[in-house]
Amino acid sequence: MNYIPTQTFYGRRWRPRPAARPWPLQATPVAPVVPDFQAQQMQQLISAVNALTMRQNAIAPARPPKPKKKKTTKPKPKTQPKKINGKTQQQKKKDKQADKKKKKPGKRERMCMKIENDCIFEVKHEGKVTGYACLVGDKVMKPAHVKGVIDNADLAKLAFKKSSKYDLECAQIPVHMRSDASKYTHEKPEGHYNWHHGAVQYSGGRFTIPTGAGKPGDSGRPIFDNKGRVVAIVLGGANEGSRTALSVVTWNKDMVTRVTPEGSEEWSAPLITAMCVLANATFPCFQPPCVPCCYENNAEATLRMLEDNVDRPGYYDLLQAALTCRNGTRHRRSVSQHFNVYKATRPYIAYCADCGAGHSCHSPVAIEAVRSEATDGMLKIQFSAQIGIDKSDNHDYTKIRYADGHAIENAVRSSLKVATSGDCFVHGTMGHFILAKCPPGEFLQVSIQDTRNAVRACRIQYHHDPQPVGREKFTIRPHYGKEIPCTTYQQTTAETVEEIDMHMPPDTPDRTLLSQQSGNVKITVGGKKVKYNCTCGTGNVGTTNSDMTINTCLIEQCHVSVTDHKKWQFNSPFVPRADEPARKGKVHIPFPLDNITCRVPMAREPTVIHGKREVTLHLHPDHPTLFSYRTLGEDPQYHEEWVTAAVERTIPVPVDGMEYHWGNNDPVRLWSQLTTEGKPHGWPHQIVQYYYGLYPAATVSAVVGMSLLALISIFASCYMLVAARSKCLTPYALTPGAAVPWTLGILCCAPRAHAASVAETMAYLWDQNQALFWLEFAAPVACILIITYCLRNVLCCCKSLSFLVLLSLGATARAYEHSTVMPNVVGFPYKAHIERPGYSPLTLQMQVVETSLEPTLNLEYITCEYKTVVPSPYVKCCGASECSTKEKPDYQCKVYTGVYPFMWGGAYCFCDSENTQLSEAYVDRSDVCRHDHASAYKAHTASLKAKVRVMYGNVNQTVDVYVNGDHAVTIGGTQFIFGPLSSAWTPFDNKIVVYKDEVFNQDFPPYGSGQPGRFGDIQSRTVESNDLYANTALKLARPSPGMVHVPYTQTPSGFKYWLKEKGTALNTKAPFGCQIKTNPVRAMNCAVGNIPVSMNLPDSAFTRIVEAPTIIDLTCTVATCTHSSDFGGVLTLTYKTNKNGDCSVHSHSNVATLQEATAKVKTAGKVTLHFSTASASPSFVVSLCSARATCSASCEPPKDHIVPYAASHSNVVFPDMSGTALSWVQKISGGLGAFAIGAILVLVVVTCIGLRR
């Protein structure tokens, strides 16, 4: 659902009122067609009378058009007013008059009321207005926190889409109501606006009102501008003293924005006072009207009244009132008050499958449930005894009361034992619940020592394996560590939101009350209320409170049971219930799950050894510790493992960066630098070694290619020389006595006819004249050298030109006056040089400080761990039961015939085969769902918010811009337009799951299609909504003979299975170094894409050239240079100027990035600047004010292989060839080229001469 309304209107019934004039309107007389003198005099007279009337009106108010006669009353004698509470009656009267005057609506309020008459509707809950819905554009909007339905038949039927991000519900307006809708606008100049209670001030992006002008119940009211357009919808407010800041939903140009001041409260009206019923009469739940409603006076009637009101909102007020018997006096709240509810309950005896000796029994300490939702490993155990209250219903934390037959006995709390594979440490106890910290184990046992010193125990199968908190599996809490969020059971006995169901206990059979006496059966009640049913004779059925005798009867013919409905007991599946309808009560339980922080250890820092593009970590864990790492490029290459012993791990570190996470320590990010062996400005083998370390494949390819070219050139040259000599000498060799001309002889090295061979000649010269020998040898060498140096000089002249041509082929970033493109990389400085005729150049510097990619989310549902609710079974003795349909998730109900259950006192029923048991079960959200649940969202278009720092001249400002589209902002009086981003990339899929502070890209099933044992087996919109869906494969089974229980089978929780198999969160493996955050879900600082920027700088941002220093004789000298290092170069600008001042400095190429943006200059001096480059031989132009100089440097590779910061320069440099390397290439290629050219010339000349013959 798009929460930006569409401006669709068919006409408005309201138009803004024209501005009021400060003078009364007078009827203008009609001028005569032919003016005359008398008419002019009459006109002057009328004007004078009007002026006189206006002066009188300024002194006294005008009379109404139809004055009403006032009734004259006799003046009453003045009496001294009586003082009441320090105030007189006159003061009270004045206060009332002031209140009446204050309630009169002002101009702004009246104007809003006219508009609101059509476009807003009340939202009502149980007949009371809780807020408002507003018609804006083509949509009806209602705050999501306002409970109730819209008080309009057409609008109440609409299907609303809910957005938790904006706290808003939205639906399309019916077509016939669009004429009632208000316009809206995103234009919000600072000033005053209107709403129902008067003026609203808008300043600094916040709406504020005087404190007291708004109140709960105003949620959903619109704020209008002076044209009647909606600019915002009120959600709540935050009291800030004399003024209240409003929490609103408003509109920007292309998106919806929610403004929530700190401390804001929702302004939905509080619900009405909860009412309860008694005998078809209603009353406030906290004020029962009858004396018998006091539990101490009539226990059973009071419990029945509570059962009748168990589902009403004021149930707990009624429970408190009935138990404390409020009589107008105030009761002190104390710890014992928390135990007061337990006087209406009692412990019980239930079936236990293992009573500690391998056999089953009916145990007074039967274990009902074990909860382990706390992440700190704490267990919350529920059993059938009660702790902290004695058998007299008094609070005593040293006692445990348990059921011993029909009686209640006390045990000492110190005898309580809880154990798994070892003894547990008990942290807290109250009522039916125990908090304990236990070692891992496969069973759980609870035991006490009764009054006869016998051990009463119950053991159940339970797998306890607490998971670690954080990234280290430790056992002992450290003295020093790191605090991280976790959950635990809060050790408090105060009332909580968690509750358990109670019900009336069943009639308990007890054969010990029967005795045989001379053919008669005697029933000994012992002060109890007993039901009896004997088949001997007639009429032997009833209830008695005293001993009685059944004549002529046997014990086997009688069935007696004790009935006691003065106390509730827990709704246990191991004890039958007394009533067939699902009557129940509820009580709060202690020890709620709470969000806290847990101290966890921090693994010892690893020993880090930096290598070339890799890092070696020596890990020394004290306990199993999680180690993970990822790269920060497009492919994260995530890896994780649990380390249990000292190991060594080597991790590759690319230029894009790497992040490793060791235990609970903070993640560490590292970047590699372009380090290598050799020298870029040394001998050829050193240069080859240098480039082989940086680009091994390219270097090998280049060297092999150049070698092949050299060999081919040499072989080709030799072949041409041999061919030329052959062509030259062949004709003369075939002609006897022919003489070879001396020119051909020189070219072809042809021997004379009378001369010896070359070897003989050279040997002769060596023996006879060595000086001539060396001259003969030096001549051709000299020729070759002369040709080589000539070619070298030609190449040197073209060197700079060819280098610049190649450099222009690379990626460069140039800044123009009104548009540029900056990289979307946090911390990367981007600078542009702006020139304007008549002004000194201006350096514009921009840097992305922070980015936030926030998708638009639509909550599909939440899922969490379920709990299976198994009410006490209903056993119908001597009859049949029937299941009824109930609107419960995954509800199951079955009736089993032929049951014959036993309780601790004997058979529950008197019949043998006509008994039936009604078993039912359903699924509900676990109590832990409030703290531990996963939310399934559908993600739509994401908005990218960037915080950009802009600096130019004297302006240094940081702005927030949305770069999905065009976003215009004003910085220092200059309009900048940012966006749209070059890449629409997002790390989020269209379906994501959010669990605590982790985000997962996961394809989850839609609402209503969950599968048992999988993610989404239970689904609901919120953790408290009534739209719970469940599919857990719950199936009931037939109870075992002779036992009272409700067996069932069910697929384990899909949520808990998902927690084990959920995999790695997007937080740790997001590409491009994204940092995933929640509340709201967003990706921070993703280094992807470029941001176009357009600007329109005024002339005032520049310095006139006549006012700026004039730089002359600017020269650049590079002192030191280390490439591929963060500002590892230092250069010095030497200059002369006509006056002192400030000059902007800038590098006009992406080959180098300057650290400084401005420099102070004097009449003569030097300026030292720092630069960063990735080139070994950078050559770049630096400007100081309007003067420019070329800087050339010979850079050395960095010494540090790994650094903890990213490079501040562009790594894309082409060609990255040092000047020395180019010189050696030119020398080698020049020599080979000269040799090849000489061979070509010889071949050409010989060929030409041969053709002339």
From Swiss-Prot:
InterPro entries: Alpha_E1_glycop (IPR002548), Alpha_E2_glycop (IPR000936), Alpha_E3_glycop (IPR002533), Alphavir_E2_A (IPR042304), Alphavir_E2_B (IPR042305), Alphavir_E2_C (IPR042306), Flavivir/Alphavir_Ig-like_sf (IPR000336), Glycoprot_cen/dimer_sf (IPR036253). Residues 105-119 are annotated as: Ribosome-binding. Residues 119-267 form the Peptidase S3 domain. Its EC number is 3.4.21.90. Residues 268-701, 756-770, 814-1230 are extracellular. Residues 161-166 are annotated as: Interaction with spike glycoprotein E2. Pfam families: Alpha_E1_glycop (PF01589), Alpha_E2_glycop (PF00943), Alpha_E3_glycop (PF01563), Peptidase_S3 (PF00944). This is Structural polyprotein.
